Amino acid sequence: MRSFLTVFLTLSLIFAISCALKQKEIDPWLNTISGGKPPEIDITGKWYDTQGSGFFTWGEGYLRQEQNKITGTIGDYNIKGVVSGKIVCLVFLSRNTVYYTARLEMFQDLLSGNYFKATNKEQKRGYPTSFTKTVDPTKK
């Protein structure tokens, strides 16, 4: 029974890893999931997780948008993404491994939506998350 359990757990882990979004799949996946509309927003700037503190927070983020492409960091994760209309689709990477994806929508200075485990390529049943943009006091 013990060996069966070990084999089952090992195969489950291999299956979960093989189903996750891979580094080479990011660009095609982002283009497919985003919808391909021209960007209506620019999310370049400094962002904060609205949860602030607690068990799980993303932390501070710095995003740069060029046309519809997004790069940057949020907390310990490197970010790659696209903007389609007012929708933002992000991939959270660390050491070339995809851990999470997110689908967010811009409402004034708030990005709000859901994040998903990398194994959830269809982005169903996500976890709520949101980020608020920091106002640069020198630009007032």
Regions found by a protein language model. Name each.
Residues 2-46, 52, 130-140:
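Amphipathic/hydrophobic helical signal segments and adjacent flexible N-terminal regions
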Residues 19-20, 111-115:
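Extended, hydrophobic interaction surfaces within ordered domains
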Residues 29-107, 114-115, 125:
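Central antiparallel beta-sheet cores of small beta-barrel/beta-sandwich binding domains
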Residues 121:
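Short acidic/polar inter-strand loop motif in beta-rich domains
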